[in-house]
From Swiss-Prot:
The gene is hemL. It is an enzyme of class 5 (isomerase). It holds the Pfam family Aminotran_3. It comes from Methylacidiphilum infernorum (isolate V4) (Methylokorus infernorum (strain V4)). One of its GO terms (cellular component) is cytoplasm. The modification N6-(pyridoxal phosphate)lysine is found at K272. Pathway: Porphyrin-containing compound metabolism; protoporphyrin-IX biosynthesis; 5-aminolevulinate from L-glutamyl-tRNA(Glu): step 2/2. Its cofactor is pyridoxal 5'-phosphate. This is Glutamate-1-semialdehyde 2,1-aminomutase. Keywords: Cytoplasm, Isomerase, Porphyrin biosynthesis, Pyridoxal phosphate. It is found in: Cytoplasm. Homodimer.
Length: 433
């Protein structure tokens, strides 16, 4: 049951202690609740679509470990697989047959992946993909899109400069300008600027990396023809195409966004779902490109915990469950019901907001403007979102604690969960000034 009268005594105590130990009190910035105010809660356990904090407050969870938990928390098959693997040890520093089994499951779903290398995070996978692209092409520059997040490696943690075609400036202290100067940042869904960028710098560009459905600046799908234009143009200039499917892989479809859009990238970056909730990342692609990696080729990459048996076991269990009972029809039904109800609220209430959805991913944007690029997202009403988030949290609904993030559905969510979310959204927005 949802506990509507909440207290956060233990969470507040832990938060005060955490601030003495961790920078900003957290091990990942968004968890600080800095974007929404107040202090974060601390989780004691989770099961299905619910999480419970240390004070005993229950929440319906729409963060789902940032998309990793497509079957919800503590799915029996995943828990069982990790428990069995744990009996055989936590890490070997050597090869395991589990690596091969998980790789085969991924290959069977994504034909573009002829060879694959496991790493420990999406950041590491994106960093490796860029190194591969530079190594095989002999070129140094890369293109990315404003609002697309590819982890916190130096070359990719950048935003656009004063003009759409300028080189990027660092989005963090500690990044030498000489590194970010090799990254060109383009506006999302802008074909004309894309074509101009390739005309000017395409022959110097090793790769263009993108989330095929932008999901780290809220949810912003590509407009019709945009990905096809990008792929065709990249081919003309000999530029590799890297799909960052850390979020969309195995979530939009079994074959990810590349299945949905019918595009086979040169390299694919994966994470989240393929680890069943444990730390993992992967980069895969064409054999001739992937064979540039050491020990076969001259592009170096290594990792002590790469292919960790616990993460491999969890990933195998999750992907086998997906193949055994494909969740996409159920998730689309839930998502469609949610979208229809939210659109009805939009018609009834004067509060200006947008609701974007693709499959089991969705975002609320407090603005009257249609959202088609990161620039549109940056102008949303952050104070209104903060009020919205906090009111939902105190109603037992946990959305991502930032106006710039995407929420997720899982197979553990029920129609009752959706009805409850819709009810609270309506009640909160009806009272909002």
């Amino acid at each position: 049951m949802i506990k509507l009268e909440m207290d956060f005594v233990l969470s507040e105590k832990l938060w005060k202690e955490a601030q003495e130990i961790f920078p900003g009190g957290v091990n990942s910035p968004v968890r600080s609740f800095q974007s929404v105010g107040g202090f974060p809660f601390y989780v004691s356990r989770a099961k299905g679509s619910k999480i419970t904090d240390v004070d005993g407050n229950d929440y319906t969870d729409y963060v789902c470990s940032w998309g990793a938990l497509i079957h919800g928390h503590a799915h029996p098959a995943v828990v069982r697989a990790v428990g069995e693997a744990l009996k055989d040890g936590t890490s070997y520093g050597a090869n395991s047959p589990l690596e091969i089994k998980l790789a085969r499951l991924i290959q069977s779903a994504m034909p573009s992946i002829e060879k694959i290398r496991f790493v420990n995070s999406g950041t590491e996978a994106c960093m490796t993909a860029i190194r591969i692209a530079r190594g095989v092409s002999g070129r140094e520059k890369i293109m990315k899109f404003e609002g697309c997040y590819h982890g916190h490696s130096d070359s990719l943690l950048v935003k656009a400069g004063s003009g759409a075609l300028t080189t990027a400036v660092p989005n963090s202290a500690g990044i030498p300008p000489c590194l970010s100067s090799l990254t060109l940042v383009l506006p999302w869904n802008d074909r004309q600027t894309l074509l101009e960028a390739f005309k000017r710098q395409g022959k110097e560009t090793a790769a263009v990396i993108l989330e095929p459905v932008l999901a780290n600046c809220g949810l912003i799908p590509p407009e019709e023809g945009f990905l096809e234009c990008l792929f065709k143009t990249a081919r003309e200039y000999g530029t590799l195409v890297i799909f960052d499917e850390v979020i969309t892989g195995f979530r939009l479809a079994l074959g990810g966004a590349q299945e949905i859009f019918g595009i086979q990238p040169d390299l694919t970056v994966l994470g989240k779902i393929i680890g069943g909730g444990l730390p993992v990342g992967a980069v895969g692609g064409k054999k001739e490109i992937m064979d540039s990696l050491s020990p076969l080729g001259s592009v170096y990459q290594a990792g002590t915990l790469s292919g960790n048996p616990l993460a491999m076991a969890a990933g195998i269990a999750q992907l086998e469950q997906i193949k055994k009972a494909p969740p996409y029809s159920h998730l689309e039904t839930l998502g469609s019901e949610l979208e229809s109800a939210i659109k009805d609220i939009q018609r009834k209430l004067p509060i200006p907001f947008q609701f974007n959805r693709r499959g089991s991913l969705f975002s609320f944007f407090f603005t009257a403007k249609n959202i088609r690029s990161a620039t549109d997202v940056y102008s949303v009403d952050k104070k209104r979102f903060s009020c919205f988030f906090t009111s939902l949290l105190h109603s037992g609904i946990f959305l991502p604690p930032s106006p710039f993030e995407t929420a997720f559905l899982s197979t553990a969510h029920s129609e009752t969960d959706i009805d409850e979310l819709v009810k609270f959204v309506y009640d909160i927005l009806k009272k909002m000034p």
